[in-house]
Each structure stands twice: as structure tokens, then as C-alpha cells.
Amino acid sequence: MTPTPDAQAARELIRQAVSIPSLSGEEQAIAAFLRDWMARRGFDAQVDEAGNAVGVRGSGPLTVALLGHMDTVPGDIPVRVDEAGVLHGRGSVDAKGSLCTFIAAVSALPPEALSAARFVCIGATEEEAPSSKGARYAMRQHRPDFVLIGEPSGWAGLTLGYKGRLVAKVRVEKDNFHTAGDGTSAADDLTLGWQRVREWAAGFAPADSGGGGIFDRVQVTLQDLGSSGDGLTQRAWATIGLRLPPALAPYQAEEAIEQAFAGLGADLTFTGHESAVRHPKDNALTRALRVAIREQGGTPTFKVKTGTSDMNVVAELWPVPTLAYGPGDSALDHTPEERLDLAEYDRAVAVLTSALTRLVGG
């Protein structure tokens, strides 16, 4: 089936967006492109002080924030649309597909929706970096009544929450000694601490989790590990990544890591303090999306994700109905096979256009 002119314009938007390289910290070209695309279609568009591409349509009393991100991880995937109508390219799924869905849907809203609300599309910078620079700036500039986060959920999926995050950098140094003697090496001590961390994580079970799935458990991984010596001093180091459930705050995880390495002479530093978030599934926003998905022949599916997104970043300052939405399979994020079926993208745009209109009573 040949796409309508509006759908064809939406497809051209995502194809061009994916064609523009935009690593974290290098989003200037994509920001200018999105600003100009939105300005030509009636948005009040600008690139803000954080480098975000921001476009606003509508003049009503409600405010709906649609927060996506423009940056991608590294990886040069030749951009092409294959014979099956699938767009290949870095960012097609994570997460230019979602951001372009937001922009295309808002550009298609009817006058009655635009008189009921302001729709603020934000293409944020540095979501793929620990800074989340764009989201942290945007959350202090806007006070929305509803929030959509642009991350792939599949066109019929609605993501309610993401796990929290903490990164621990561990370093152990001690004087060198003869291995025939009685003692432990720096690597021994670091390994013992790591074993204690794993035991703590495996045993973590909040009373109200009912045994829960992976979303309610602590996940720990070694992201970096090494040791060295110069004949005088032994050194061992590691980076430990933690994914945190809603029942565990980052400061509580810090305390557990410190206890695990107690008495081992370890130097610990922590970064990436993000609390887990899980939003309710029955509110005006989720109801509007569920109805719109059914209109397109789908069955709405609620999800929670073990990763972390800008939903975690904005949750404290934006305590309003929130969910993440966008086309594509998140299993393809950051992979050499990243690709998005444009028919699914079309459907997501249609779903969101209908849902936003219903949400604001248009």
C-alpha cells in the first residue's frame, strides 16, 4: 500500500534524521535539521541552550511533553531502505524512530487538539551519555501535565518503568610481597569484595516483591577488571555496574558495596545515581494510548525495562502520568543489525496522533 502524503513526509523525516550522524556530544547537525523541519510545519522551533531541538505546537491550557533523544551510540551502519520497506541505520530504533514518531504525530494533530493543549517535542542531547544533559536541562524549563518518553516499545507496547543505575569504580593497592609468603594480593582482595557483592545481589529480596521477576532484583556485572604491579606496589581495579529495582535507592546500594569491600583497603567512587521508576498503568495517558492501539488492530502490552532512560532522570521534577512509547524492537538497540520496519513506524505515528487528540479531549 502506497503511504499517504503525510505518511510519506513522516518517512522522509526519519530517513533523513537517521542519515545524519549524531554521536553523544555531536548533535548540532541533527538538532538544526529537526528545528528547521518543525519550523516549516508550524512549530515554534528552536535549539535551546543545552543543544536540544525543541518544537511547540498548540495554545491550550494543558501541556504535553514528548521527550526523545537525538544522540546515538557509535557504529556506522549504512543507511538504506530495503525491498521490504525496512530502514537500516544507527538510531533507527534507539531512538530517532521514537523521536520522529513524536514530531510527525504532533505535526498531524487537528485544530481542536491544538486549541486544547501545548505539545512540546524535545529532541534531547546526550541521553546515551551518563550526563543526560538535554533531559536535565529540559526538565527545569517545562512543567507538563503529561509526559511521553521516546524509547522503543513496539508500536503496541507501553513502557511504564525502568530500573535504576549505579556504577562503582574500585581500586585496591598494596605493597608487593613474595607469593611464597602468607598473604593476599591486591587482585585477591578485589575478587573477594566482588564475590561479596554478588552474594548480596543474589540475596536481595524486598518483602513486598513476592519473589518478583528480574525488574525487582539487583543485577550486577563486571564492566572492567584488571591488575598490574611494578615490583613495589600491586594494583587491582574494577568497574561494577548495578541495575537497581524500585525497592533499592542508589545510596542504599552504595552502602552495600562499601560493606562488601570493608577491610580490604579498597578505594571506591560512585557515579550514575539513578533511581528506578515505575508509573501507574491506569490514567488518562495510558487509557488514550490503549484505545488508539486497539483502533489500529493491536493489543496493548504494558512493559517494564531493565535498562535506564530519561524517564528516570525527569521523574522527580515531573511527577505526572508518564510512559515511554516508540516503534521498534529494543533488542536491536546498539547492535549492527539496528533497523526499523517503516510500516510499524507509520502505525506508531497513527496511534500517537489519535491518542494525543483523545488525551486532550480534542
UniProtKB/Swiss-Prot annotation:
It comes from the Bacteria. One of its GO terms (biological process) is lysine biosynthetic process via aminoadipic acid. Its cofactor is Zn(2+); Co(2+). GO terms for cellular component: cytoplasm. Zn(2+) 2 binds at D94, E128, H334. Keywords: Amino-acid biosynthesis, Cobalt, Cytoplasm, Hydrolase, Lysine biosynthesis, Metal-binding, Zinc. The active site is at D71, E127. Pathway: Amino-acid biosynthesis; L-lysine biosynthesis via AAA pathway; L-lysine from L-alpha-aminoadipate (Thermus route): step 5/5. Catalyzes the release of L-lysine from [LysW]-gamma-L-lysine. NCBIfam families: dapE-lys-deAc, PRK04443.1. This is [LysW]-lysine hydrolase. It comes from Deinococcus radiodurans (strain ATCC 13939 / DSM 20539 / JCM 16871 / CCUG 27074 / LMG 4051 / NBRC 15346 / NCIMB 9279 / VKM B-1422 / R1). The gene is lysK.
